[in-house]
């Protein structure tokens, strides 16, 4: 290393000197000052632009005021001022206002917009099929009614005809089809659409799309139609845009006398549509009823809970029949509405009744179940002294002697602990199987559809263990379970005092109603005196059943029970048939017999200890299950019980529908 010499080409190494702290801070401060100057310059420019813009606005405003002073207009009220703010198209030579209406029809979606506001939009899957109808007030343009009629299903076209016939003349009608609306659109409905001026509606075909706007009793304002090219496809979507001229308020109002009843009527009829003569200008139907008082009315102070949802037209029909029943106490009626819907409350207010709304809890059948629980709890809170409550649904017609029926039988609930309820509905009481309005039965099932509930039963047993919101159970099926019923029975009439008219609901459609509800017999005779009411008590009823069986004529069991000739062509006789029933839950033969008798066959209803009572050809007809029923002892030794083989079950067949 001693002989090493540095290269003369390389610069000698020297340690780098650090920049002094003074120079470092001077550099930083110089950069910050430059940034500050830039920001200040930008702010000055922004303020300058703002000042220029404001000066221009002030000058424009002064110029406009000066021009207005040179050509002054007369003073205008508020409505006229609003008119001046409308678009130039609406300020034409005609003083009437005009609505912009858009209507859309397609396979999967419908919508209606009025002046840019969407008043209907339905694109939910597997819902909203059929013809959607909207009614607008011809003077204000506000929506008075929205309905959808699933005219793919039976009888929905009848409901649509009824609704459209009840709409007042002059109203604006809007129709649009989602998915399919022609399958059950019968001639009567087509004729009505033709009378409204529609050309495409009466010719509506399978899966066609259609949009229509017109005035009832007036001109058609727009219509579009697209025909389906094949059975497997739909018509093209159609979008109808049209103008709807509005009429004066004078043309849209009725001039009734200024009374408290008519003030209620006026409020109602200015908001909603589809209620027919209640809003007639010339001869409106009454909204106050004066049925005859019921002598010795045992249910005068029993609260009545009407369970309702968003079916206001059903509620209107139901309340009319309820308020027309002899012995009704309007002050004891409370309508419980599941949700904050306006129109059902409007119906309640029309009749001057009490209405209570509450927030829905859960979904589907659990929501209905929670609504019942909330309503029953509220009923007994409103009337803490009440021992009973009458429970009704919004889709029931109420018989004229409904309260008379309850008044004559309600003491049984107090005196007989073996009873679960009193119901106005007979599950097997069809037009061809019910005959005697004075006759009562004991049955092991809880029919519902107009029934009396004992407060002690609800507060001590049912309320504490009512199904919770997460359980998607039907409340009535739960109440029929052995754990709740505990061997108790219900009293029912042979001829029902309620009629289930609703065809739209959670577990209801047109097909189901046609098969199981439409042909139920409904009492229309006032003042029926029930016969031998005390014989419905537990021990007395057994005596009555044994008496009937002892007097009954045994039918020829070699004949087919499904044939009309199985029962003789007589009247006023009592007959008995014995069917195979190996155990208490063996209902195979009964179910097949119920099918061929065209009565309720989806589960077992209306039985008492393995015995069913009904009428055939105006004869009292008893059916006894052998050997499960204790009444099997009445079977003659020579008689072989009837056995009907159930059909083989198809794989993947859907389960039975349930009544609600």
UniProtKB/Swiss-Prot annotation:
It catalyses: 3-O-(alpha-D-mannosyl)-L-threonyl-[protein] + UDP-N-acetyl-alpha-D-glucosamine = 3-O-(N-acetyl-beta-D-glucosaminyl-(1->2)-alpha-D-mannosyl)-L-threonyl-[protein] + UDP + H(+). Residues 300-646 are annotated as: Catalytic. The manganese ion interacts primarily with the substrate UDP-N-acetylglucosamine. The keyword Phosphoprotein applies. The keyword DNA repair does not apply. It is found in: Golgi apparatus membrane. Its main location: Golgi. Residues 59-660 are lumenal. The modification Phosphoserine is found at residue 7. This is Protein O-linked-mannose beta-1,2-N-acetylglucosaminyltransferase 1.
């Amino acid at each position: 290393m001693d002989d090493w010499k540095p290269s003369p080409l390389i610069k000698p190494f020297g340690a780098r000197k650090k920049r002094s702290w003074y120079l470092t801070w001077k550099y930083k401060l110089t950069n910050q000052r430059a940034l500050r100057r830039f920001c200040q310059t930008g702010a000055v420019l922004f303020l300058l632009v703002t000042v220029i813009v404001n000066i221009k606005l002030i000058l424009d405003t002064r110029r406009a005021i000066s021009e207005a002073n040179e050509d002054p207009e007369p003073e205008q009220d508020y409505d006229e001022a609003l008119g001046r703010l409308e678009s130039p198209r609406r300020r034409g030579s005609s003083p009437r206002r005009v609505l912009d209406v858009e209507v859309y029809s397609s396979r999967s979606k419908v919508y209606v917009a009025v002046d840019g506001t969407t008043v209907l939009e339905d694109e939910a899957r597997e819902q909203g099929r059929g013809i959607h109808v909207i009614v607008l007030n011809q003077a204000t343009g506000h929506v008075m009614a929205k309905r959808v009629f699933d005219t793919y299903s039976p009888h929905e076209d009848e409901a649509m005809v009824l609704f459209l016939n009840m709409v007042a003349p002059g109203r604006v009608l809007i129709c649009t089809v989602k998915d399919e609306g022609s399958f059950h659109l019968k001639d009567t409905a087509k004729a009505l659409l033709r009378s409204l001026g529609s050309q495409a509606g009466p010719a509506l075909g399978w899966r066609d799309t259609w949009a229509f706007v017109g005035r009832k009793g007036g001109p058609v304002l727009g219509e579009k139609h697209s025909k389906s090219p094949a059975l497997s496809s739909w018509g093209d979507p159609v979008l109808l845009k049209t103008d709807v001229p509005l009429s004066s308020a004078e043309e849209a109002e009725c001039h009734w006398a200024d009374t408290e009843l008519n003030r209620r009527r006026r409020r109602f009829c200015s908001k909603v549509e589809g209620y027919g003569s209640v809003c007639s200008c010339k001869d409106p139907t009454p909204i106050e009823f004066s049925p005859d008082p019921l002598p010795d009315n045992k249910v005068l102070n029993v609260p009545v809970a009407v369970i309702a949802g968003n079916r206001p037209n059903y509620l209107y029909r139901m309340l009319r029949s309820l308020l027309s029943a002899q012995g009704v106490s309007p002050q004891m009626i409370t309508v419980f509405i599941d949700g904050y819907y306006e129109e059902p409350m409007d119906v309640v207010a029309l009749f001057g009744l009490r209405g209570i709304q509450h927030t829905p809890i859960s979904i589907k059948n659990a929501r209905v179940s929670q609504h019942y629980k909330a309503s029953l709890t509220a009923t007994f809170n409103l009337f803490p002294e009440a021992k009973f409550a009458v429970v009704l649904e919004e889709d029931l017609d109420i018989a004229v002697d409904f309260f008379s029926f309850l008044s004559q039988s309600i003491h049984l609930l107090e005196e007989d602990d073996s009873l679960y309820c009193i119901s106005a509905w007979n599950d097997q009481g069809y037009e061809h199987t019910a005959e005697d309005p004075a006759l009562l039965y004991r049955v092991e099932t809880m029919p519902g559809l107009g029934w009396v509930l004992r407060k002690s039963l609800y507060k001590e047993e049912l309320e504490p263990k009512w199904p919770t919101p997460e359980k998607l159970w039907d409340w009535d099926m739960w109440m029929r379970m052995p754990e709740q019923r505990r061997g108790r029975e219900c009293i029912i009439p042979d001829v029902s005092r309620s009629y289930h008219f609703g065809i739209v609901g959670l577990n209801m459609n047109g097909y189901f109603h046609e098969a199981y509800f439409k042909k139920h017999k409904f009492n229309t005779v006032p003042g029926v005196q029930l016969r031998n009411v005390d014989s419905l008590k537990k021990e007395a009823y057994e005596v009555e059943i044994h008496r009937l069986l002892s007097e009954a004529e045994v039918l020829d069991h070699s004949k087919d029970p499904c044939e009309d000739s199985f029962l003789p062509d007589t009247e006023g006789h009592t007959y008995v048939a014995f069917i195979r029933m190996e155990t208490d839950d063996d209902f195979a033969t009964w179910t097949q017999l119920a099918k061929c008798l065209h009565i309720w066959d989806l589960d077992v209803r209306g039985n008492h200890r393995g015995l069913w009572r009904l009428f055939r050809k105006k004869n009292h007809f008893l059916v006894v299950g052998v050997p499960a029923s204790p009444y099997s002892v009445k079977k003659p030794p020579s008689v072989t019980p009837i056995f009907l083989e159930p059909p083989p079950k198809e794989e993947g067949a859907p389960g039975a529908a349930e009544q609600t």
